[in-house]
From Swiss-Prot:
CDD domains: ABC_PstB_phosphate_transporter (cd03260). Belongs to the ABC transporter superfamily. Phosphate importer (TC 3.A.1.7) family. One of its GO terms (cellular component) is plasma membrane. Its EC number is 7.3.2.1. This is Phosphate import ATP-binding protein PstB 1.
């Protein structure tokens, strides 16, 4: 069926359909999303476990990035977007009227397809979010820079050039810098929207190895069009098609013995 070889680290899978509240980082309940009159997500319910990597896979335009962006309400920025249902982060509905969206996005970091460092130094990129929070102590900022760059496997490469422009880094280094910027504010969850789609194979492998390290500190949710990548990095995988959650299980089951024919057809290349 599929050569499942998660060489980047393996933990016994959880039963994602019977997670306890303690095991759950994100609970999505009867989620529907509309862009104007067009419905993009249809009644999605799932629980995403803490401290694991969960991958969303599916054909282009299937709704996987839309679903990802519901977790930190990035879809709020799209005119005409309407959401029904609930997305709970550690038990609290992020769509509750009293939720401060800026605070939510500090708790849920996000990395996009293309590296997007700011036109600032490497140092200032990392501390950007901390400065917005009012952190001014130099020692605190210095410590955060080293901690975050180490977490992003970038410290040894840039420790002697922290005050150089971030645009001088390679594409792979820039993406790791963006990850360092995201983790500097110590989020609970990291959302990765096709984070290696613009990178070369060597940089892609570095990011994949980094993802395996990041899950020791954060809950990671990744959207990827690359099924081999999903098999390598994810503990659990959700297959989405036409805005519907078709199948969700541990990655090994999805890629070697899927329960749904739609899933099997997709991962064997019959469509998508």
């Amino acid at each position: 069926m599929f050569n499942f070889d998660n060489t980047l680290g393996y933990e016994p899978p959880l039963d994602v359909h019977n997670l306890t509240d303690e095991q759950t980082a994100i609970s999505i309940e009867n989620l529907n999303l509309f862009y104007g009159q067009a419905q993009a997500l249809h009644d999605i319910s799932m629980r995403i476990p803490k401290g694991r990597v969960t991958a969303f896979i599916g054909p282009s335009g299937c709704g996987k990035s839309t679903l990802l962006r519901c977790i930190n309400r990035m879809n709020d920025l799209v005119e005409g977007c309407k959401v029904t249902g609930k997305v709970r982060l550690h038990g609290k509905n992020v769509y509750h009227p009293n939720v401060d969206v800026a605070t939510l996005r500090r708790r849920v970091g996000m990395v996009f397809q293309r590296p997007n460092p700011f036109p600032k130094s490497i140092y200032e990129n990392v501390v950007y979010g901390l400065r917005l929070q009012g952190v001014k102590n130099s020692r605190t900022l210095d410590d955060a820079v080293e901690r975050s760059l180490r977490s992003a496997a970038l410290w040894d490469e840039v420790k002697d050039r922290l005050h150089e422009n971030a645009f001088g880094l390679s594409g792979g280094q820039q993406q790791r810098l963006v990850i360092a910027r995201a983790v500097a504010i110590e989020p609970e969850v990291l959302l990765l929207d096709e984070p290696t789609s613009a990178l070369d194979p060597i940089s892609t492998l570095t990011i994949e190895e980094l993802i395996n390290e990041l899950k020791t500190q954060y809950t990671v949710v990744i959207v990827t069009h690359n099924m081999q990548q999903a098999a390598r990095v994810s503990d659990h995988t959700a297959f989405i098609h036409m805005g519907k959650l078709i199948e969700y299980s541990d990655a090994d089951s999805i890629f070697t013995s899927p329960m749904k024919k739609q899933t099997e057809d997709y991962i064997t290349g019959r469509y998508g």
